[in-house]
């Protein structure tokens, strides 16, 4: 009997992650995967009823503008799967969309798997109640999440992090510099101010002013800034014109110098240290074993929302950056909110660039973390999904 697997991914990271799992699932040619997905999933044999960008939104304003379209897409896939239930449904990240869909399908008798645990350990812990109702089985990327969900009575499997499988245990700085055309002996700083317009608008001026100070200390310092696309590059370069940094290299995926790799990976691999916005990029920097300074700054209105939300819930972890969360320690500096000043960013980043002993300690801790996260994620996830599907058969 063939298996039908419903799946929804709403972000490029989810598309890539799901594509690897689909490849594992479709080793059995009778397995059919369909739903909402991107080009990587389709290349792996996924039948996309709707393209992934139907769910991709950038911020609250964009979400409000696109709400009618999102509701139509949700209604369409829900109707299809209620009329012809899949053997199992897999929601890949995108919790605001997928948890609602998972609840409807599970209540109708379809087993559900949620792949990539919502960051309830960071904020909105109250979502655990909805997760318990909506999800038959959680697949999580971080080891500490397994214990968290198990304590809440939710079946869970730790599958490791796909970035740990994809990023080499021993980065090749010389090869990365050759790809990017950088001097082998230069001191290189990778600057990653985020992938959203709002992040770039707020963080880029602070990061660039810090870079200006660093270049006054070391005029030979080379700054490399990867951007997710041409639009973000244009936004960044408009800010760069106000805070010029001589010799700064701004790269996008279109640049042949990236060598076919994610452009951020080339920048990180080539660097001596990293100044980075809190987010997945901090984990990438850690997997490349680079010392870093993590920063973030919320707008005043977002701060008010977060302050109110935090008053309603349990206290959260003291760390923001993923490397520190995973290591349960301030292994690298975090400069957040009012501490995210150009002066403080420059001072901390200078230490990351020049303190060789600290860099060696950080590299050793990140290497151990990398080993802990390496689990052949795609194979483990595919196996767990099939077990849930067969267990419900």
Swiss-Prot record:
GO terms for biological process: lipid A biosynthetic process. Its EC number is 2.4.1.182. It catalyses: a lipid X + a UDP-2-N,3-O-bis[(3R)-3-hydroxyacyl]-alpha-D-glucosamine = a lipid A disaccharide + UDP + H(+). It is an enzyme of class 2 (transferase). Keywords: Glycosyltransferase, Lipid A biosynthesis, Lipid biosynthesis, Lipid metabolism, Transferase. It comes from the Bacteria. GO terms for molecular function: lipid-A-disaccharide synthase activity; phospholipid binding. One of its GO terms (cellular component) is membrane. Pathway: Bacterial outer membrane biogenesis; LPS lipid A biosynthesis. HAMAP family: LpxB. Belongs to the LpxB family. Condensation of UDP-2,3-diacylglucosamine and 2,3-diacylglucosamine-1-phosphate to form lipid A disaccharide, a precursor of lipid A, a phosphorylated glycolipid that anchors the lipopolysaccharide to the outer membrane of the cell. This is Lipid-A-disaccharide synthase. It comes from Bordetella petrii (strain ATCC BAA-461 / DSM 12804 / CCUG 43448). The gene is lpxB.
């Amino acid at each position: 009997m063939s298996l039908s697997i419903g799946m929804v991914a709403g972000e490029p990271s989810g598309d890539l992650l799901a594509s690897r799992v689909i490849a594992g699932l479709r080793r059995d040619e009778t397995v059919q995967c369909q739903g909402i997905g991107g080009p990587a999933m389709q290349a792996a044999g996924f039948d996309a009823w709707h393209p992934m960008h139907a769910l991709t939104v950038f911020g609250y304003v964009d979400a409000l503008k696109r709400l009618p379209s999102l509701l139509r897409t949700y209604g369409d896939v829900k109707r299809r799967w209620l009329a012809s239930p899949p053997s199992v449904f897999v929601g890949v990240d995108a919790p605001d969309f997928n948890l609602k869909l998972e609840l409807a399908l599970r209540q109708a008798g379809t087993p559900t798997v949620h792949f990539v645990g919502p960051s309830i350990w960071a904020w909105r812990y109250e979502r655990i109640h909805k997760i318990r109702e909506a999800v038959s089985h959680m697949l999580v990327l971080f080891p500490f999440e397994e214990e968290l969900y198990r304590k809440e009575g939710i079946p869970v499997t730790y599958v490791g992090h796909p970035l740990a499988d994809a990023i080499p245990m021993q980065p090749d700085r010389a090869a990365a510099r050759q790809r990017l055309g950088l001097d082998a002996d230069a001191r290189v700083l990778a600057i990653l101010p985020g992938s959203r317009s709002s992040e770039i608008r707020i963080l880029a001026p602070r990061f660039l002013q810090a870079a200006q100070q660093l270049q006054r200390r070391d005029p030979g310092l080379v700054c490399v800034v990867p951007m997710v696309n041409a639009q973000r590059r244009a936004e960044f370069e408009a800010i760069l014109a106000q805070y010029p940094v001589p010799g700064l290299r701004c790269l996008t995926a279109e640049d042949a110098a990236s060598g076919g790799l994610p452009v951020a990976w080339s920048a990180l691999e080539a660097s001596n240290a990293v100044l980075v916005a809190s987010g997945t990029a901090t984990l990438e920097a850690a997997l490349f074993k680079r010392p870093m300074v993590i920063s973030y700054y919320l707008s005043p209105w977002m701060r008010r929302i977060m302050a109110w939300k935090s008053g309603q819930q349990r206290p959260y972890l003291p760390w923001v950056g993923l490397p520190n969360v995973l290591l349960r320690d301030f292994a690298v500096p975090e400069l957040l909110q009012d501490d995210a000043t150009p002066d403080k960013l420059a001072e901390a980043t200078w230490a990351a660039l020049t303190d060789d002993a600290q860099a060696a300690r950080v590299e050793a801790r990140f290497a151990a973390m990398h080993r802990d996260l390496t689990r052949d994620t795609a194979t483990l996830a595919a196996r767990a999904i099939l077990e849930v599907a067969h267990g419900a058969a």
